[in-house]
C-alpha cells in the first residue's frame, strides 16, 4: 500500500468524514476554507483538495447530489473510504457500500450541519466548542431496576463554554418523520437515564439539556406541546428549536 503524505487540512477533513459519515462540499467549505476572500475561490480550493483525496481513493462522493445536478459541485456529498480510514489508522466502523436512503442522508447531513453551525459560532468568538461527539461516541447505556440494559442513542453530544458558563447538550435531530408518541418515548428514555444519576456524576452534577432540532415552526410547536402535556415536571429538561434558529439560540445564550 502506497504511503500518502497528508497535509494538516487533508487529515482534518478525513477525520471529520470518519466521524460524521457524510458532509457536503458546502459544509466542508464552511469549516475549512473560510480564509478565502471570495466564495468562488473557497469552493475551487475545496474541490481541488477533495479531488486529490478522491484520486488517492481516500474519499468518494455519492451519485446523488443535494439539490440535484444543477446545484453544481458544492452539492456533492462526501464520505470516507476504507483506505481513508486506514490512512487515519482508525478501525472501519461504517461500510458505505450502498447509496443511503434519502431520509437517512438528510438526517445525517442535518447532524453535520449542527456541528458546522457550532464551529462557525466558535470562529466568531461566541462560544468555545469543547467537545462534539457524533454517533456512536455520544451513545449512553444504563440499566433498569430489573437489570435490563437500555441504549440511549442521541444524534450528538455537545459541550460548550459560553462566557463563564459551561453548557452541555444531547442533540436530537428530528426530520418530522417520526410520530409524536415516538418522540415522547425517546424523551422518557432521557428521564430514566437522568434518574440513574450516571451522567450527573460525569458532568459535575449537571444533566445536559436535551435539544430537539426540528425542520420548521409547525413541528416545533407540536413537539413542544407533546413534551409539556406528557412529561409533567420533567419538561424543563427539553428544549425545541428549528435548525434555522439553532445558531442564534445557542449564540444568544451568551447574553443571558
Give each language-model segment a name.
Residues 160-256:
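C-terminal regulatory/effector modules of DNA-binding transcriptional regulators
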Residues 32, 50-54, 114-122, 190-198, ...:
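Hydrophobic, Leu/Ile/Phe/Ala-enriched alpha-helical segments that form helix-helix packing faces
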Residues 1-99:
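Nuclease-adjacent, charged terminal/linker segments that flank catalytic cores
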Amino acid at each position: 500500500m502506497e504511503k500518502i503524505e497528508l497535509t494538516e487540512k487533508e487529515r482534518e477533513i478525513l477525520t471529520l468524514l470518519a466521524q460524521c459519515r457524510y458532509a457536503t462540499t458546502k459544509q466542508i467549505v464552511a469549516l475549512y476554507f473560510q480564509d478565502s476572500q471570495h466564495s468562488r475561490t473557497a469552493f475551487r480550493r475545496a474541490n481541488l483538495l477533495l479531488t486529490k483525496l478522491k484520486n488517492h481513493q481516500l474519499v468518494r462522493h455519492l451519485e446523488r447530489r443535494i439539490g440535484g445536478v444543477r446545484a453544481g459541485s458544492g452539492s456533492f456529498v462526501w464520505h470516507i473510504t476504507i483506505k481513508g480510514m486506514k490512512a487515519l489508522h482508525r478501525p472501519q466502523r461504517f461500510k458505505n457500500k450502498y447509496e443511503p436512503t434519502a431520509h437517512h442522508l438528510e438526517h445525517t447531513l442535518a447532524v453535520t450541519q449542527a456541528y458546522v453551525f457550532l464551529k462557525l459560532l466558535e470562529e466568531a468568538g461566541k462560544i468555545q466548542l469543547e467537545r462534539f461527539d457524533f454517533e456512536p461516541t455520544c451513545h449512553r447505556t444504563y440499566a433498569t431496576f430489573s437489570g435490563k440494559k437500555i441504549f440511549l442513542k442521541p444524534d450528538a453530544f455537545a459541550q460548550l463554554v459560553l462566557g463563564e458558563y459551561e453548557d452541555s447538550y444531547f442533540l436530537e435531530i428530528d426530520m418530522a418523520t417520526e410520530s409524536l408518541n415516538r418522540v415522547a418515548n425517546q424523551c422518557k428514555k432521557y428521564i430514566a437515564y437522568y434518574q440513574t444519576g450516571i451522567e450527573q456524576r460525569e458532568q459535575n452534577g449537571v444533566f445536559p439539556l436535551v435539544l430537539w432540532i426540528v425542520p420548521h415552526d409547525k413541528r416545533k410547536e407540536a413537539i413542544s406541546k407533546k413534551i409539556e402535556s406528557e412529561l409533567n415536571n420533567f419538561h424543563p429538561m427539553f428544549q425545541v428549536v428549528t435548525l434555522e434558529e439553532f445558531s442564534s439560540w445557542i449564540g444568544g445564550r451568551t447574553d443571558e
